[in-house]
Amino acid sequence: MSKKRNIILIFLLVLGVLLISGCWLISTPTYTITYDGNGHTGGSVPTDSTVYKENDTVTILDKGDLVKTGYTFAGWNTQADGSGTDHAVGSTFIIGASDVTLYAKWAINSYTVTFNSQGGSAVSSQTVNHGGKVSKPTDPTKTGYAFAGWYKESGCTNAWDFATDTVTSNITLYAKWTPLYALRDTGPAGGLIFYVKEGGYSDGWMYLEAAPASTEWTGKQWGSYGTLIGGTGTGIGTGQSNTTIIVNWLNSNTDNTYGDVTNKTDRAAYLCDALTLDGYSDWFLPSKDELNLMWENLKVSGVGGFAGNVYWSSSEFSANHAWGQVFSNGGQNFNYKNYSFRVRAVRAF
């Protein structure tokens, strides 16, 4: 009986030792946390080497150097498609009785597409997702120009293809413009273009058009001989104001010594100002420099029907003289205002 009791005691003692030491046949289950880059294009996924038991607290790791081109990291999720439970970096959760895989959650980047119309009408910007295409906007407009497409740089070398080009960053597209008219083209009033303003449309005009040869006058005086009207200029862009100044003087003058009262409507500037052709009535006598451009860009090229004689400009030189130009050789000289020369009207638009 004593021997049997001893055996039982020994068994119980061994059992107790096993229980105390944890060396029992049944072990406690453990679980792992795995991080998945979910389509990342660079960097390495973080590694959690901790062995967890059910109900342990898990702290969510940072993404480290994990990246995906065109996307921004937005935390972790229990499903690859992002439909599961979100877990922010640094947050915690209680692990259950299973391994857990956390998938990187990526938010697609969006970019701003800005349209620089380079002097044309405004075009609204667009927001486009990474890899997306830009919607072609309505063409802008610019006075004096024809729209010629959108380009990737202000110099307009590489065109943007709305059908194939995609957006991968914030970009600016630039409008390209081509002049509606080139030198020696026929203008809207039927004359020839003899000047295209280098800086483009400004101050209400971009082109100078010479009236057709059929409108030219011969044997016309400048007027105001013996009187300095003053205020006229010689530069490009001054012909119209010159003409207005001269016509105003002719209309207010009462001295008919040289016939400027009775013959005012037959003076060079007055004739140009009164011209109406194909609905256009904005003609004027060209300034000295404008007259030279007409000789240089039309007469020298053999177009425009110009004679080789002297033509009047609207630029006054003195009380007795005004500037004219010999169209046979281009020479510019001041001449007596009561001399009779040819007159060709021009317009700016």
What are these regions (language model features)?
Residues 1-26:
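Sec-dependent, cleavable N-terminal signal peptides
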Residues 3, 25-179:
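Secondary-structure capping and domain/repeat boundary segments
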Residues 23-27, 109, 176-278, 328, ...:
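Short, compositionally biased
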Residues 31, 72, 100, 111, ...:
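Residues that flank catalytic or metal-binding motifs in active/ligand-binding sites
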Residues 39, 80, 119, 212-214, ...:
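Short, flexible loop/turn elements at secondary-structure junctions
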Residues 41-55, 84-91, 121-134, 158-166, ...:
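Short, polar loop/linker segments at the starts of domains and inter-domain junctions
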Residues 74, 148-149, 178-179, 198, ...:
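C-terminal, surface-exposed recognition/capping segments
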